[in-house]
């Protein structure tokens, strides 16, 4: 059986292989016989270590001779365990021995961090670093486009840029993506900056229009308030005039119960007033002895002879409404009834 051990991650020049050779050695202890397993280790090196082999050959032969003397007869020769690498490093301290001892280290980390920092980074770490840098640049660009986070930077435009943007806003208050990119290229700006400028301009326009509408509504409200007060004063005056009129004249067919409307003026019909005056004069000059003589009263004759003011002109609507249907009271009511209205006795009765 052959066992090969490879210690460390040593580069090219040194490679140590150990080939153990198990050997059974009988030992006599009392009446029992025991078997002892001895591993023989053989160290092989390359041509670069020939100088070390010559230095340690004499020491190996001396050690083998001592073992042969102490070993009982009949035993098989066993190669001694020898580690010439450690011996050479302890005695000579040459550069080759240091390299050999370094080959047995199993992935040991260097003591200082300078060596690790000096080594080139792996491709994965470089890719991660570049990705982080791209993300940071993108976030910075987004913050700048959006106006920044805590400290917002105001966009400074020249007079030419401002005038051109104002003219474009008068033509179109909103922009399509193509128009936005064209404006950005023409004014040497980013499309996001043009879009933000148009948004702010629309907001300012809407705010100004709201202020104008508010002022107009305030003026309208004040004007309506003054008009309402004036109308209330007129209504109060008209109600006072109506009360005065109804107290001076008798009620005319319940017109005093009607509500007073704005701008309405109540007038008394002249023909009705004249008829009332004539009737009063006739009642005052009436006497029973006048009828006894068979003559008509002078007052009535004079009243009949005096033409009414509206005789030469067609009667008005109010005169036709009130004068034609005025009831007649007195002893002369039978004389004015037409004879055709009297009921004649029938011939059959």
UniProtKB/Swiss-Prot annotation:
Q: Where is this region: Leucine-zipper?
A: 208-252
Biased composition of type Polar residues is found at: 89-99, 121-135
Annotated Gene Ontology cellular components are: nucleus
Q: Which UniProt keywords apply?
A: DNA-binding, Homeobox, Nucleus, Transcription, Transcription regulation
Q: Which Pfam families match?
A: HALZ (PF02183), Homeodomain (PF00046)
Q: Describe, from its UniProt entry, the tissues in which this protein is expressed.
A: Expressed in seedlings, roots, leaves, nodes, internodes, flowers and embryo.
Region of interest (Disordered), residue spans:
42-186
Residues in the DNA-binding region annotation = 150-209
SUPFAM superfamilies, per database record: Homeodomain-like (SSF46689)
Domain of life, source organism: Eukaryota
Q: State the InterPro entries in the record.
A: HD, HD-ZIP_Homeobox_LZ_Class_II, Homeobox_CS, Homeodomain-like_sf, Leu_zip_homeo
Basic and acidic residues bias (residue ranges)? 167-183
Where in or outside the cell it occurs: the entry states: Nucleus
One Gene Ontology molecular-function label: sequence-specific DNA binding
The protein's predominant localisation is nucleus
Describe, as the record does, how this protein assembles with itself and its partners: Homodimer. May form a heterodimer with HOX1, HOX2 or HOX3.
Protein family: Belongs to the HD-ZIP homeobox family. Class II subfamily.
Known role: Probable transcription factor that binds to the DNA sequence 5'-CAAT[GC]ATTG-3'.
What is the protein name stated in its UniProt record? Homeobox-leucine zipper protein HOX7
Organism lineage string: Eukaryota, Viridiplantae, Streptophyta, Embryophyta, Tracheophyta
């Amino acid at each position: 059986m052959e066992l090969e051990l490879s210690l460390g991650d040593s580069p090219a020049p040194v490679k140590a292989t150990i080939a153990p050779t198990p050997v059974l050695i009988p030992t006599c202890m009392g009446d029992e016989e025991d078997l002892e397993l001895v591993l023989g280790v053989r160290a092989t090196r390359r041509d670069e270590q020939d100088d070390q082999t010559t230095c340690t050959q004499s020491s190996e032969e001396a050690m083998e001779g001592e073992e042969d003397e102490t070993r009982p007869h009949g035993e098989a020769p066993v190669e001694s365990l020898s580690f010439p690498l450690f011996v050479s490093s302890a005695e000579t301290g040459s550069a080759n021995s240091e390299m050999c001892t370094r080959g047995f280290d199993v992935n040991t980390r260097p003591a200082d961090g300078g060596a690790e920092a000096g080594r080139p980074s792996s491709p994965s770490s470089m890719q991660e670093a570049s990705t982080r840098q791209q993300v940071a640049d993108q976030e910075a660009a987004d913050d700048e486009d959006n106006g920044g986070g805590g400290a917002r930077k105001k966009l400074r435009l020249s007079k030419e840029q401002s005038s051109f943007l104002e003219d474009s806003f008068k033509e179109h208050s909103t922009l399509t993506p193509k128009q936005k990119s064209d404006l950005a290229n023409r004014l040497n700006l980013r499309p996001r900056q043009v879009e933000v400028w148009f948004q702010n301009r629309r907001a300012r326009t809407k705010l100004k229009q709201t202020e104008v509408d508010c002022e107009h509504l305030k003026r309208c409200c004040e004007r309506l308030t003054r008009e309402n007060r004036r109308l209330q004063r007129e209504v109060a005056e008209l109600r006072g005039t109506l009360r005065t009129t109804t107290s001076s004249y008798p009620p005319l067919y319940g017109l005093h119960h009607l509500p007073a409307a704005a701008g309405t003026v109540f007038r008394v019909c002249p023909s009705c007033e004249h008829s009332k005056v004539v009737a009063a004069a006739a009642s005052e000059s009436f006497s029973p002895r006048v009828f006894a003589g068979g003559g008509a009263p002078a007052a009535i004759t004079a009243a009949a002879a005096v033409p009414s003011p509206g005789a030469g002109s067609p009667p008005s609507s109010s005169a036709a409404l009130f004068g034609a249907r005025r009831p007649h009271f007195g002893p002369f009511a039978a004389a004015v009834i037409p004879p055709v209205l009297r009921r004649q006795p029938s011939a059959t009765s």
